Design a protein with these regions (language model features):
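Conserved hydrophobic residues forming the short capping helix/wall of the S-adenosyl-L-methionine
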Residues: 14, 107, 159, 229, ...
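Conserved Class I SAM-dependent methyltransferase catalytic core
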Residues: 84, 216-278
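Non-catalytic accessory regions of SAM-dependent methyltransferases
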Residues: 1-47
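Conserved AdoMet
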Residues: 30-106
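Conserved SAM/SAH cofactor-binding pocket of Class I
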Residues: 97-198, 224
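Mobile active-site "lid"/loop adjacent to the S-adenosyl-L-methionine
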Residues: 190-220
């Protein structure tokens, strides 16, 4: 069976179960670890029997267990870079790319020549690694922390694979962090436990709950970071968060209560998603 035939057969299987047919192509491309261009030029190439068997095993796993693509193949792409994904870290989200974009936009406009950056709740390390690779015209020192040793091991592996020099620290937020930072960035757990029933099984069953849910209606980590950030921000330092679509007012309130001026930006779906907080001395 060649690649095109395998994809057509997989599409039929997915269609019968009312699944997204585009998964058929992307799953085979990811499994073979090829770029879109490489893959498109080899559609008539025969699959090895081992490849064919593995491919349809993965297709059936998605159908029967609703396993996400990234967990089927063990990696995902973020900002055009490849990152290892396991059950111990979140799969990369498109919304987080928008957080990266806003941070890069801020850095580009800044008159500073160097930045010391702290990435709290780093998970797989995608934020820290992407910033290290994308900021090329200014010097950066990046520290990334997480409370999960398993997540940190994945982040370290991802940094090595992407040739990104980052300091990783096991820490519950600021507990083991020292020094001042020009930027504090975080995409912390922010889903309220009461919203758990609204979350898709493909997320609940495969993403770590430690990285998804937070107390205080999802605000706990934002509150802890905002209340303590002044001790870790350098002069004119800034905080960037990814936030839940319904958390804007709570972030504004937390910012105001701790002398921060808050700006919230919408994502591509016109939902409140990125918060920027500047300390109002």
């Amino acid at each position: 069976m060649n690649r095109r035939q395998a994809i057509l057969k997989a599409c039929l299987l997915l269609r019968r179960q009312d699944k997204e047919e585009s998964l058929a192509k992307f799953l085979l491309m990811y499994m073979l670890d090829e770029t879109t261009e490489q893959f498109s030029n080899k559609l008539s190439e025969e699959l090895l029997i081992e490849q064919e068997n593995r491919y349809f095993d993965l297709i059936n796993k998605n159908i029967n267990e609703d396993t996400p693509l990234s967990h089927l193949v063990g990696f995902d792409y973020f900002y055009d870079r490849k990152f290892k994904v396991t059950k111990d870290v979140l799969s990369p989200r498109m919304e987080t790319e928008e957080l990266i974009y806003k941070v890069l936009e801020y850095i580009k406009k800044s008159k500073k020549d160097s930045f010391r950056i702290l990435d709290l709740c780093t998970g797989s390390g995608i934020i820290a690694i992407t910033l290290k690779k994308e900021i090329v015209k200014k010097y950066t020192e990046i520290v990334a922390s997480d409370i999960s040793e398993k997540a940190l091991s994945i982040a370290i592996e991802n940094a090595d694979n992407n040739n990104a020099n980052i300091t990783f620290i096991k820490s519950d937020l600021f507990d083991n962090i020292s020094g001042k930072f020009d930027l504090i960035i975080s995409n912390p757990p922010y889903i309220s436990y009461k919203d758990k029933i609204t979350i898709k099984d493909s997320v609940l069953n495969y993403d770590p709950h430690l990285a998804l849910f937070a107390e205080e209606d999802g605000i706990y980590f934002y509150r802890k970071i905002i209340e303590n950030a002044v001790h870790y921000l350098s002069k004119d330092g800034v905080i960037f968060f990814e936030i839940g679509y319904d958390q804007k007012e709570k972030i504004f309130e937390l910012g105001k209560n701790n002398n921060f001026i808050t700006t919230v930006y919408k994502d591509i779906n016109d939902r409140d998603r990125i918060a920027k907080l500047i300390y109002d001395k």
